[in-house]
């Protein structure tokens, strides 16, 4: 059972997350031949103050 964990900065819309889930599922089905019913995708919404880029939080960078 393929299991993908996706970490993204918070703020994406429900539609964007749905698209990520659909496309990651499709990619795993094509890449490893797993039935789509067996693919799991878990999206982690990371608060901007908890995401660091070059030593600075994404919040401080205005991301």
UniProtKB/Swiss-Prot annotation:
Catalytic activity: (2Z,4E)-2-hydroxyhexa-2,4-dienedioate = (3E)-2-oxohex-3-enedioate
Alphabetic keyword roster: Aromatic hydrocarbons catabolism, Isomerase
Listed EC numbers: 5.3.2.6
Major enzyme class: isomerase
A molecular-function term among this protein's GO annotations: isomerase activity
One Pfam assignment: Tautomerase
Record: active site: 2
Protein name: 2-hydroxymuconate tautomerase
Record organism: Comamonas testosteroni
């Amino acid at each position: 059972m393929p299991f993908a964990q996706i970490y993204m900065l918070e703020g994406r819309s429900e539609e964007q997350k749905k698209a990520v889930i659909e496309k990651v599922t499709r990619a795993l089905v094509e890449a490893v031949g797993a039935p789509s019913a067996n693919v799991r995708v878990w999206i982690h919404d990371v608060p901007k103050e908890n995401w660091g880029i070059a030593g600075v939080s994404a919040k401080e960078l205005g991301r």
